[in-house]
């Protein structure tokens, strides 16, 4: 696929974007309205899978597009270098690169058009978050950028709102065009949440979007892409499937977002990311967002971002939010059940509280959910063996508070952003300290406080040193029992008994099929009867 033909243009023409293979026609309901329906497709089998080769780009022949929309507010212009440095220091913000825009301090200073500003103010946000104060001017200026900030810091709106401005400045989609904005995310849950934000703030501009992810039927996703969408939020694997089978293309993408880039690389998506990005014109605007700054993310930045500017809120060192109270209990496997119940009783003293419990395996997820439900706790499980419909239902029940306790594995919980989670309980510790920080970051978001309880066993001894370091940085109280593991991790020869074996939770393993039940989605542990020993 090459774009060396000077006749290429947006809409119309033999080699145009939206050209002959779709046979004319159009679609309605989007920006500019009524264009009728899609015409017939051109030759060839639509379902044939085609290997994605890297195009030979000729920048001079590509249609021009606008990407700099930033008009600095007079109040921002008037700020001195000393004022800017003081603001960044106050917000623990560091910037790297050349010609970096000054941060803004209010929504009015951001320079958004009225139709965007109206949507923001209707949501009742008091002021921009730290990452938004610097990220919005960067994104609106059309620069390639890297944003590094902890989860729950407002990163989604940092790229979502500028994308709406970007879309409205581009020519309308023609039949056969792919999206203008592409957002890559590591998990289906995060992709769905990004879509919700895009829908919320893009509705007034009639900007259409779709969410393309695995584990769900392709039919609706294909229909959305065929009708035409300005924004596509996708997980890498499913998007490549859509590209290879000709269900969409990336020829119109001029605004690319890599969200939770570190997580995507952790999950092994680097080859897919590179294959996808190679399909997009190189003069696009690229925005990379990450919670950490490992060397793998740095390499991706060097390869795909052009003269980027970077904002980091907080330390590049791995750290937990200081709004989270971390409680670590050194226990045996046999003690976990009783300790869990005690903390649930504390957590649910607040009737509005939500509690997220992490388990290491899908089996443990189901077993503890069965146990809790039998004891009268309204718990539901979410993990990779649950079908997408059930996962969506569980998440909805948890968000609305109908089932305020959710038991999850790491993979299933990645990208989940639920407001009001007051307690996170690590029933099983994760395998590394990065996942620990990511887990407990589900609470204490956007300035609110939260509590994270972790059950630490002798089997987790390798995490002892890193865990103590994270707790010290956040000014947390480290129990003496845990400090012994800290010394051991730094070479102490002190030995401690292993404690009483693995033990664990026993209960029904059967996953079963879907049952009718409430909402028609429950399977296995989620369909276990709820005991009457609790106030629920």
Swiss-Prot record:
Subunit structure: Associates with polysomes.
Free-text function comment from the UniProt entry: ATP-dependent RNA helicase involved nonsense-mediated mRNA decay and ribosome biogenesis through rRNA processing.
Domain Helicase ATP-binding, first and last residues per copy: 136-311
Name of the protein: ATP-dependent RNA helicase DBP2
Annotated segments matching region RNA-binding RGG-box: 496-520
Regions that span the bilayer: none
Motif Q motif, residue range(s) on this chain: 105-133
Chemical reaction(s) catalysed: ATP + H2O = ADP + phosphate + H(+)
Record organism: Debaryomyces hansenii (strain ATCC 36239 / CBS 767 / BCRC 21394 / JCM 1990 / NBRC 0083 / IGC 2968)
Lineage: Eukaryota, Fungi, Dikarya, Ascomycota, Saccharomycotina
Enzyme class, first EC level, given as a word: hydrolase
Motif (DEAD box): 259-262
Subcellular localization: Cytoplasm; Nucleus
Segments for region (Disordered): 496-536
GO biological process, one term: rRNA processing
Record keywords, A-Z: ATP-binding, Cytoplasm, Helicase, Hydrolase, Nonsense-mediated mRNA decay, Nucleotide-binding, Nucleus, Ribosome biogenesis, RNA-binding, rRNA processing
EC number: 3.6.4.13
Binding site for ATP: 149-156
Gene3D superfamilies assigned to the protein according to its UniProt record, in alphabetical order: P-loop containing nucleotide triphosphate hydrolases
Annotated family: Belongs to the DEAD box helicase family. DDX5/DBP2 subfamily.
Domain Helicase C-terminal per the UniProt entry, residue ranges: 326-486
Keyword Cytoplasm listed: yes
């Amino acid at each position: 696929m090459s774009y060396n033909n000077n006749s290429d243009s947006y809409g119309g023409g033999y080699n145009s974007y939206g050209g002959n293979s779709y046979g004319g026609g159009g679609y309605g309901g989007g920006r500019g309205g009524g264009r009728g329906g899609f015409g017939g497709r051109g030759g060839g089998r639509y379902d044939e899978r085609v290997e994605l080769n890297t195009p030979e780009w000729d920048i001079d022949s590509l249609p021009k597009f606008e990407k700099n929309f930033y008009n600095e507010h007079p109040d921002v212009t008037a700020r001195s270098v000393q004022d800017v440095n003081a603001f960044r220091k106050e917000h623990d913000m560091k910037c790297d690169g050349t010609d970096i825009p000054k941060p803004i301090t209010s929504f009015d200073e951001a320079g958004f058009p009225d139709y965007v500003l109206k949507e923001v103010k209707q949501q009742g946000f008091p002021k921009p978050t730290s990452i938004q104060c610097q990220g919005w001017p960067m994104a609106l200026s059309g620069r390639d950028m890297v944003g590094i900030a902890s989860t729950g810091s407002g990163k989604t709106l940092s790229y979502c709102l500028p994308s709406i401005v970007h879309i409205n400045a581009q020519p309308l989609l023609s039949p056969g065009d792919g999206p203008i904005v592409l957002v890559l995310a590591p998990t289906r849950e995060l992709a769905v949440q990004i879509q919700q934000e895009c829908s919320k703030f893009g509705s007034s501009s009639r900007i259409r979007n779709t969410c393309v992810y695995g584990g769900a039927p392709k039919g609706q996703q294909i229909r959305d892409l065929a009708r035409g969408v300005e924004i596509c939020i996708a997980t890498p694997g499913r998007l490549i499937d859509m590209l290879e089978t000709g269900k969409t293309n990336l020829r119109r993408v001029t605004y690319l977002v890599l969200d939770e880039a570190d997580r995507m690389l952790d999950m092994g998506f680097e080859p897919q990311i590179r294959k996808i990005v190679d399909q997009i014109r190189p003069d696009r605007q690229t925005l990379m967002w990450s919670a950490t700054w490992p060397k793998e993310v740095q390499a991706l930045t060097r390869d795909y971002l052009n003269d980027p500017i970077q904002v980091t809120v907080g330390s590049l060192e791995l750290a937990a939010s200081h709004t989270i109270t971390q409680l670590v209990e050194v226990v045996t496997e046999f003690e976990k059940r009783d300790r869990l119940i005690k903390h649930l009783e504390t957590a649910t003293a607040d009737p509005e509280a939500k509690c997220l419990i992490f388990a290491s395996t899908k089996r443990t997820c189901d077993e503890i959910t069965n146990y809790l439900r039998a004891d009268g706790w309204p718990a539901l499980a979410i993990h990779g063996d649950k079908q997408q419909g059930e996962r969506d239902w569980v998440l909805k029940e948890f968000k609305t508070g109908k089932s305020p306790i959710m038991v999850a594995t790491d993979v299933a919980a990645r990208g989940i952003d639920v407001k009001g989670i007051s307690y996170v309980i690590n029933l099983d510790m994760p395998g590394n300290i990065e996942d620990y920080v990511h887990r407990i970051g589900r609470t204490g978001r956007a300035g609110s406080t939260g509590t994270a309880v972790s059950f630490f066993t002798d089997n987790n001894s390798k995490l002892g040193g890193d865990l103590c370091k994270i707790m010290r940085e956040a000014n947390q109280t480290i129990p003496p029992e845990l400090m012994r593991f800290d010394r051991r991790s730094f070479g102490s020869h002190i030995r401690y008994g292993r404690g009483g074996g693995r033990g664990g939770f026993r209960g029904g393993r059967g996953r079963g099929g879907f049952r009718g039940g409430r909402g028609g989605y429950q399977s296995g542990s989620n369909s276990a009867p709820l005991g009457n020993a609790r106030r629920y």
